[in-house]
Amino acid sequence: MRRILLIRIDFLGDMVCTTALIHSLKRKWPTADIHVLANKYNSYALEDNPDVKEVHRYVYSKSRERNNRSGLISSLIDKFLLIMHLKRLNFDLLIIPNGGMNKNAIQFARWMDIPDKRWHTAETEFDDRKIEHVANRPIKHEVLAGYDLVPELGVTSTDDLRLYVYPSLGLKNKWSETLENNGKANIGFFISNKAHERRWPWGNWYSLAKLLGDDFNIIIFSNPGEKPEQDALNGITVQCIDTETVPDLIAAMSRLDLVVSADSAPVHLGAALQIPVVGLFEARLEKYLRWYPIGVNHVLLHSGKCIDSISVVDVKDAVISLIPQTYD
């Protein structure tokens, strides 16, 4: 095995989950060069990863604003050049590790002259949007979807797996100076989520900060434009920070002792950084059994169709239960 190509062109958290498989592939075939085809956003999860030889940037045909050059002609040319470049590398194995079928990734893979191409089919995929899959197919962690395609690795559970990200040393130093350093544990509140059903109301975050703020440093992370207004912070002691890039986000998170987040990328980034996680999930087996943080101490809370039904007291108790294991 000389060269392996993985294609993962979806979300940041999904790419973080793929780092377990990448690491296992490198251990199985230590002399193989592992390449990854990623998109602009999720590629940051692979920066400085010693298991990865090179990351290639996917070129979109329709969502061209996501490309380095967004014009139609430029995008077509850049995609053609990308295909030709990858073909010249003569890969031995191609893997699309998604549990569901990613049509863009599969279409791209079909253009590659690679002798061994593996991805999930309509018969083997798991798409949590399809009721028949949830009702009739085994629910396993998304990480294992990739391992199912590579039985040579002999991995069938997440018990001995972990995720990997590598924060920039310079950015770690920057955030060490920026964040509170008073001997208390740093707890990250990740208050943003694009999905309505995974948004915990600000009033709950406020109440949680009120309960924990005397004993811990509360660091609030939010998406651009979603930082709480100063009036909303009256009565609580917190530090709101701006992480404008994914590398900044990873580096800032590396200074935390605990992550509190709904089901999204911070759950997996926390796990990759070996930081305990309190995860807030919808009460759907196909969510919390597929996307829990692996390789790290964690507490999962799930209730109702929307996480706003998870109580503040339950989250506080989960935080307290994990803190003694990380910070005494």
Regions found by a protein language model. Name each.
Residues 1-328:
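Catalytic machinery of carbohydrate-active enzymes
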